[in-house]
Amino acid sequence: MDGQSLSSATPLIHHDHRNTWWRCHLQLKNSLSSELSGAVGDLGTFIPIVLTLTLVSNLDLSTTLIFTAFYNISTGLLFGIPMPVQPMKSIAAVAVSETPHLTPSQIATAGASTAATLLILGVSGLMSTLYRFLPLSVVRGVQLSQGLSFAFSAIKYIRYNQDFITSKSTSARSWLGLDGLIIALSSILFLVLSTGAGETHGHNAPSRSQDPVIDDDNDPRSRGSRSSCVNKRLRILNSIPAALIVFLLGLILCFIRDPSIVKDLKFGPSKITLLKITWEDWKIGFLRAAIPQIPLSVLNSVIAVCKLSGDLFPDRELSAAKVSVSVGIMNLIGCWFGAMPVCHGAGGLAGQYRFGARSGWSVVFLGAGKLVIGLLFGNSFVRILSQFPIGILGVLLLFAGIELAMASRDMNSKEESFVMLVCAAVSLTGSSAALGFGCGILLFLLLKLRKMDYSTPSFLTPKSSVDDELSSIP
C-alpha cells in the first residue's frame, strides 16, 4: 500500500522537465515593469553606435532594427536570460574613425568573417575548451577593463557635447537646456534613489532588519517596525521602472528639442535587399575590421558574458559553445542584407540586469519594440535618434559599465587581484582587450611557475596507495 501510494503521488519525470524548462525560459522572473525597465538598460551603447554608423557609413537603420529585433526575440526565448544584442564595437570604431570610411558591404564582410570564426570555434568545441581552462582572474580583468571603459565614455557623454561623426568630444555641456547637465544629473539622482547600488529587485530586496535605526533603542518591536518601514520603502523604490522612465523622458525631449521631427517621419520600412559584395570588400573588411574584432568577440561576447551569466544567474549559466554559435548564426544571416554586425556583450547583460531584467522576456519586449519601430518608421527613425539627449545615454551607459566592473569584486587572493588589475590596466592603456588578455595569461603562468616545485618532477615521484585512496575521495 505504501509503495503504491508513493508511486501514485510521485510526479512524472518528464513533467518536471517541462516545468523546469517553462520556469527557466518562458516565465517572468520579475515584475513586468522591472523587465521593461531592464530592456532599455543597454541602449546607452546601442543607440550611439547605430546612430554613428547610420550617419557616417550609410548603415540601413530599418534593416538593422528589424534583424536585431528578431535576434532579441529568438535569443531571449532560447537562453531564458536577458541576453543582449549589441554592436560589434571594434568594427564600428574602424568603420567611422579610419579613412576612408568602411562601406556597408565592407562592414558586412567584417561581421561575417568574425561570425564564421566564432561559429567554427563553437561547433568544434574549441570555445568550450578555452572557457573551461581560462583563469578566472584574466576574465575578470577583461570585464573590469570593459566596464571602466564604458564608464569613462559615459562620463564624457555627460560632461561634453559629442560629435559622433568624428567620434570626438567637443565643447563642455552647458548646465541648462534640454540636453544639459541638470537633466543628466537629475537622471543619475533618480536612478540612484530608485535602484540604489543595484540590489535585487522586487521581493528579494535587501533587508536591514539587523541594523537598528537608533543605537540606544533596545526595543525589538520598535526595531522591527522601523525595519519593516524601510523594507516597504525599498520594495516601492525597487518596483519603479527607473531606466524605462529615463529613456521615455529622453524620447519626449527629442520632440521638444526639434518639433519638425514629426514632419520628417515617413511610414514604412526600407526595402530589404542583398548587398553586392566584391572580393575587395572581403579583403578590406577582414584585414581592417575583422582581425581586431575577433579577439574582442571571443573574450567579451562569449567568455565574459558566460562568466557573468554564471554570477548573475547561477542556475542558468550559459554554454560558451552555444553563445559562440549564436553570434555566428545571427551575423551569417543578417550581414548579407546590410544589418549591423552584432554580438552578445557582457556590458549589455550587466546593464539590463542592473535595471531589473531577470528573464528572457525582457529582451523579447525590446525586440518587439525594435520590430515595430523598424516596420513603422524605417530609416526616418534616425531623425529621432539624432535628437536623443546624449547626456541621458551617458547616464544609462555609466550604470551599465559600473555594474559590469563590479562583477570583478570576487577575487579572493592578492595574486588573483594582481593578475586582474594588470590585465585591466593593459587593456585600458592599449585600448585592446586582446593585449590585456595576453599579458594577463603570461603573468598568470609566471606566477604559477614561480611557485612550482622543481626539486622532483611530479611525474617521477612514486605514488603511494594512500595517495590513490585520497585521490578517489570526491
List each model region and its residues:
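Membrane-embedded helical hairpins/re-entrant loop segments and their flanking transmembrane helices
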Residues: 18-36, 52-74, 289-361
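Hydrophobic, membrane-embedded alpha-helices of multi-pass small-molecule transporters
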Residues: 32-37, 41-43, 174-187, 242, ...
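Short, amphipathic, aromatic/basic-enriched membrane-interface segments that mark the entry/exit
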Residues: 32-40, 53-59, 76-83, 171-179, ...
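Transmembrane alpha-helix interface/packing and boundary motifs in multi-pass membrane proteins
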Residues: 37-38, 73-83, 291-295, 329-339, ...
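Transmembrane helix-boundary motif of multi-pass solute transporters/channels
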Residues: 37-102, 312
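Short hydrophobic alpha-helical membrane-embedded segments
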Residues: 39-46, 62-67, 84-88, 178-186, ...
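Transmembrane helix boundary and interhelical junction motifs in multipass membrane proteins
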Residues: 44-48, 84-92, 302-304, 339-348, ...
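Membrane-embedded alpha-helical modules
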Residues: 99-261, 365-474
